[in-house]
UniProtKB/Swiss-Prot annotation:
Native source organism of the sequence: Mus musculus (Mouse)
Protein name in UniProt: B1 bradykinin receptor
Gene name, Swiss-Prot/TrEMBL: Bdkrb1
Cystine bridges: C117-C196
Highest taxon in the source lineage: Eukaryota
Membrane topology: Multi-pass membrane protein
Length: 334
């Protein structure tokens, strides 16, 4: 059981190649047994709340009763376009979680066939990128609203938001193409399982995957999120100094706290995943060969995957609330 750590049978995004000699470290079997018993229940819980939250967000934005709720404005605003796309992305994302939970609970013996192996893994991978890129787009939109409020309105920006969302979905699909093409179910005789794994045809693919996942999927988006939110905080701080007599302090403090919550949520949910994904790259290129670190990387990836998936539950709550608060704050500056 523990030797599947060497296989790195992550269901969503990791590349795996079964080594000829399968070994395990002392104490690893117990750790994997505990993970396979406990983790599926947590994943199903995340799936339930993720489905509920994102369906509620989409129903508010898109269903006909929204017209009764907000009669004066039937078209989606810029923020709502991004939030609706984020909810749709997270909804598709969490639909793949039951397959992942079953895979882990079944001790990584994939029971759904090769087609679902490729489709589920590819869809999860695509929406990993789509969700992160949309978070960047939301941060950029709020940056423009609060730092340059007088130039941030109009139909032209609405069309730009729609085009931006379309490009983000296309980019997510393109970045997940290797997963769609190279995922398959392979028999692992040593473990007596048929595993859904990603086998790269050449060692160079490991470096490509690291750049794609860690750089394009985390470091660059993180830099953009930090840049936009730093300037938002600086703008709010300046507005607070200029408008003390208008009782703007509490609202500014609430907005600043929300911004810090957004950034902290992104880091807490995604940083562990990308840290262990980078360790996995070092294992694949044989920079790390110690048994302990290999086992730690494999177990860490499974747990970090879970924290990344939790983000799909937090997004509806955080970003919809953030959208309403930011809209109120921007209208107050005009």
């Amino acid at each position: 059981m523990a030797s599947q750590a060497s296989l790195k049978l992550q269901p969503s995004n990791q590349s795996q190649q079964a080594p000829p000699n399968i070994t395990s470290c002392e104490g690893a079997p117990e750790a994997w047994d505990l993970l396979c018993r406990v983790l599926p229940g947590f994943v199903i819980t995340v799936c339930f709340f993720g489905l509920l939250g994102n369906l509620l967000v989409l129903s508010f934005f898109l269903l006909p009763w929204r017209r009764w709720w907000q009669q004066r404005r039937q078209r989606l605003t810029i923020a709502e376009i991004y939030l609706a796309n984020l909810a749709a992305s997270d909804l598709v994302f969490v639909l793949g979680l039951p397959f992942w939970a079953e895979n882990v609970g079944n001790r990584f013996n994939w029971p759904f066939g090769s087609d679902l192996c490729r489709v589920v893994s590819g869809v999860i991978k695509a929406n990993l990128f789509i969700s992160i890129f949309l978070v960047v787009a939301i941060s950029q939109d709020r940056y423009r609203l609060l730092v340059y409020p007088m130039t941030s309105w109009g139909n032209r920006r609405r069309r730009q938001a729609q085009v931006t969302c379309l490009l983000i979905w296309v980019a997510g699909g393109l970045l997940s193409t290797p997963t769609f093409l190279l995922r398959s179910v392979k028999v692992v005789p040593d473990l007596n399982i048929s595993a859904c794994i990603l086998l790269f045809p050449h060692e160079a693919w490991h470096f490509v995957r690291m750049v794609e996942l860690n750089v394009l999927g985390f470091l660059l988006p993180l830099a953009a999120i930090l840049y936009f939110n730093f300037h938002i905080l600086a703008s709010l701080r300046g507005q607070k100094e200029a408008s003390r007599t208008r009782c703007g302090g509490p609202k500014d403090s609430k907005t600043m706290g929300l911004i810090l919550t957004l950034v902290a949520s992104f880091l807490v949910c995604w940083a562990p995943y990308h840290f262990f994904a980078f360790l996995d790259f070092l294992v694949q290129v044989r920079v790390i060969q110690d048994c302990f670190w290999k086992e730690l990387t494999d177990l860490g990836l499974q747990l970090a995957n879970f924290f990344a998936f939790v983000n799909s539950c937090l997004n509806p709550l955080i970003y919809v609330f953030a959208g309403r608060l930011f809209k109120t704050r921007v209208l107050g500056t005009l």
